[in-house]
């Protein structure tokens, strides 16, 4: 079968990430022909479309790109990248893949065909014996919904943030100056930083996503701390026991760090049981091979 994998940014940052989806698509390439394109590029009539995007993009500056893919006559699935949901945003997609149970139940309530497909690149993110030199780490684009300012308030210069600076959302960068900050780095470097950390502290808010950050920490057997108002991350910690949930304030975060620091974690076993790139690929293939 022929597949058009569509993502705005596929010609740049997608390859830089080498995340679970990148690795999942490499598995799919072993069985099918895959072409990686931007949403404004031509899609062939015989291609099955996999489109990675937030549905709310339809109302933003790139809305015309979203609508163009949405209106294609091809068989197509949306790989939902997070954010709010409205039923009409999903019209004309044959299926929607989500990253966890929270979003699946949201879409079920809207009577939208959906299933879970998600995971990490377990070949890059794995436990390594390293000296722990960082109290807390977080990898995420600097954005209001990631709350890097809260991370910096809780950890100060004992915390390390790593992510892309956004000119259009400068507050997260300006508010986090007390922490040590790094630009977006290749996956291999991020894995080294996770393994050098006592904890991963994911301060993402309700709409903040951050599930990849949570699962990559678990893949490295590093305790992850997530916020109680971030249900998409809470579900992974609750199911795995590989971390702790705390309230989104500096004192609660510091207390949580003390509770889990130095404890043996079972995150890697949890990842290998259901959240590897192979699991990710197999779930995508269920749609592709029945399209």
Describe the predicted segments one by one.
Residues 195-209, 222:
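Acidic donor-binding loop of glycosyltransferase active sites
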Residues 1-65, 282:
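N-terminal pre-catalytic "stem/leader" segment of glycosyltransferase-like enzymes
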Residues 14-21, 122, 131-187:
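Conserved catalytic-core segment of nucleotide-activated headgroup transferases in glycan assembly
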């Amino acid at each position: 079968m022929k597949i058009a994998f569509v993502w705005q940014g596929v010609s740049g940052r997608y390859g830089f990430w080498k995340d679970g989806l990148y690795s999942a698509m490499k598995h799919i390439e072993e069985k099918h022909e895959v072409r990686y394109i931007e949403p404004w590029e031509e899609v062939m009539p015989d291609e099955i479309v996999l489109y990675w995007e937030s549905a709310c993009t339809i109302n933003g500056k790139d809305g015309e790109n979203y609508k163009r893919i949405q209106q294609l006559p091809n068989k197509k699935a949306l790989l939902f990248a997070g954010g709010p949901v409205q039923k009409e945003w999903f019209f004309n997609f044959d299926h929607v893949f989500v990253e966890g149970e929270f979003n699946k139940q949201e879409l079920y309530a809207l009577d939208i065909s959906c299933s879970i497909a998600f995971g990490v690149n377990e070949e890059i993110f794995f436990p390594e014996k390293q000296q722990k030199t960082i109290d807390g780490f977080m990898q995420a684009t600097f954005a209001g919904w990631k709350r890097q300012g809260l991370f910096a308030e809780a950890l100060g210069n004992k915390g390390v943030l790593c992510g892309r600076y956004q000119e259009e959302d400068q507050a997260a960068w300006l508010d986090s100056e007390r922490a040590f900050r790094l630009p977006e780095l290749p996956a291999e470097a991020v894995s080294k930083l996770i393994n050098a950390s006592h904890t991963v502290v994911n301060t993402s808010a309700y709409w903040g996503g951050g599930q990849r950050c949570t699962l990559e920490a678990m893949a490295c057997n590093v305790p992850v701390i997530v916020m109680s108002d971030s249900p998409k991350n809470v579900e992974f910690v609750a199911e795995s026991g590989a971390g702790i949930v705390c309230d989104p304030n500096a004192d609660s975060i510091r207390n949580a760090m003390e509770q889990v620091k130095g404890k043996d974690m079972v995150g890697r076993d949890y990842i290998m049981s259901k959240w590897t790139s192979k699991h990710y690929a197999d779930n995508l293939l269920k749609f592709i091979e029945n399209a």
